[in-house]
């Protein structure tokens, strides 16, 4: 029994020694794998940091746009603001601004958000929408009245552009003819143009922002998709019209550089429309009264009246029948008028 116990003890020692060797070898392999993984992981952040550093060096235009609206904005204005945020990768949003606050508060909010430009949609009476575009640092700021708003969801056009892609800004030749339009063109380029090498932008161009000048210096905005290499255009949306109200030297303040003489307030237009409606209603009432009167006259004339006297006044039909009797009556009347002439004696002349 002693020999077997010794053999068993030796086998246990050998198995324990082999187990220790296997564990040591596994530890070496795991350490080598960990070191290789750590080296790979170290290389990845290094590459990422190098890419970000290169892109940061190329990203020289650090324009950021603050897009927000006032309280009481209607649904169409909110959807338009959402579409603009989707089209501008360098845009930042904020909560609605109370209308009781001064517009100068927007400059402080833009500085807190590290934004250099502001697009503020101001709604009045839940009917009229005004768009403010401002350069926070030095000005200027422009106030527009927004007409004919149609959002992407409403239009459902066939065109489609990728999100966060860079647009081509296309301007009408009329922007170079007037000084106020030149300034508006510069503000639109700085506000709506996506900076090159922006971190959130895609490195390609697939749509066009078109700005054209219409009657009364109204600016028409359209967004078109560039279809493949054929360079055909398909409208994407949104679409709206901007009518300039005033142009200020500062950011939401300062001297008035230009006041649009063709601008008419929506309140004045609604007042004139109401006046026109009142005059129109009066005209319609007068026409109705005259029509009723004419209908009564025609109805009276159409009725057949009965002559109660009989044939006495029917002179046309009874003239032939009563001609003899009438002749006798007239003869008697004329006889009475004829006087008998008395015979007069001849006067004495003295010749006898």
Curated annotation (Swiss-Prot):
Acidic residues compositional bias, start-end: 32-42
Sorted UniProt keywords: Nucleus, Ribosome biogenesis
Coiled coil: none
Locations listed in the record: Nucleus, Nucleolus
Cross-referenced Pfam families: Brix
Domain Brix: 63-253
PROSITE patterns: BRIX
UniProt keyword DNA-binding, yes or no: no
Nucleus recorded as keyword: yes
Region (Disordered): 1-55
GO cellular component, as recorded: nucleolus
GO biological process: ribosomal large subunit assembly; rRNA processing
InterPro entries, per database record: Brix, BRX1
Chief place of localization: nucleus
GO molecular function terms noted in the UniProt entry: RNA binding; rRNA binding
Basic and acidic residues composition-biased segments: 9-22, 43-55
Function as written in the Swiss-Prot or TrEMBL entry: Required for biogenesis of the 60S ribosomal subunit.
Family stated for the protein in its record: Belongs to the BRX1 family.
Protein name, entry field: Ribosome biogenesis protein BRX1 homolog
Species classification: Eukaryota, Metazoa, Ecdysozoa, Nematoda, Chromadorea
């Amino acid at each position: 029994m002693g020999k077997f116990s010794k053999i068993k003890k030796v086998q246990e020692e050998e198995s324990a020694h082999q187990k220790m060797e296997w564990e040591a070898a596994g530890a070496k392999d795991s350490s080598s794998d960990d070191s290789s993984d750590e080296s790979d992981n170290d290389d990845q952040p290094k590459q990422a940091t190098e890419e970000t550093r290169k892109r940061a060096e190329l990203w020289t235009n650090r324009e950021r746009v603050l897009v927000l609206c006032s309280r009481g904005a209607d649904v169409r204005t909110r959807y338009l603001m959402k579409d603009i945020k989707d089209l501008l990768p360098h845009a930042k949003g904020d909560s609605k601004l109370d209308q009781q606050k001064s517009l100068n508060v927007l400059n402080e909010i833009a500085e807190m958000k590290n934004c250099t430009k502001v697009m503020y949609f101001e709604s009045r009476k839940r009917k009229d929408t005004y768009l403010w575009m401002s350069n926070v640092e030095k000005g200027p700021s422009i106030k527009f009245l927004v007409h004919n708003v149609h959002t992407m969801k409403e239009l459902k056009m066939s065109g489609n552009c990728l999100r966060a892609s860079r647009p081509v800004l296309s301007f009408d030749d009329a922007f170079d003819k007037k000084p106020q339009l030149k300034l508006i063109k510069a503000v639109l380029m700085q506000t709506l143009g996506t900076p090159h090498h922006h971190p959130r932008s895609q490195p390609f161009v697939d749509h066009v922002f078109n700005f054209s000048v219409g009657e009364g210096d109204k600016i028409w905005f359209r967004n078109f998709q560039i279809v493949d290499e054929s360079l055909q255009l398909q409208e994407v949306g949104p679409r709206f019209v901007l009518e300039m109200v005033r142009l200020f030297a500062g950011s939401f303040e300062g001297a008035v550089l230009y006041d649009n003489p063709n601008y008419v307030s929506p309140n004045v237009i609604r007042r004139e429309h109401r006046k026109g409606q009142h005059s129109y209603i009066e005209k319609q009432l007068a026409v109705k009264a005259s029509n009723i009167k004419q209908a009564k006259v025609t109805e009276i004339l159409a009725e057949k009246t009965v002559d109660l006297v009989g044939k006495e006044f029917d002179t046309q039909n009874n003239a032939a029948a009563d001609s003899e009797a009438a002749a006798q009556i007239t003869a008697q009347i004329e006889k009475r008028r004829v006087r008998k002439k008395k015979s007069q004696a001849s006067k004495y002349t003295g010749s006898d």
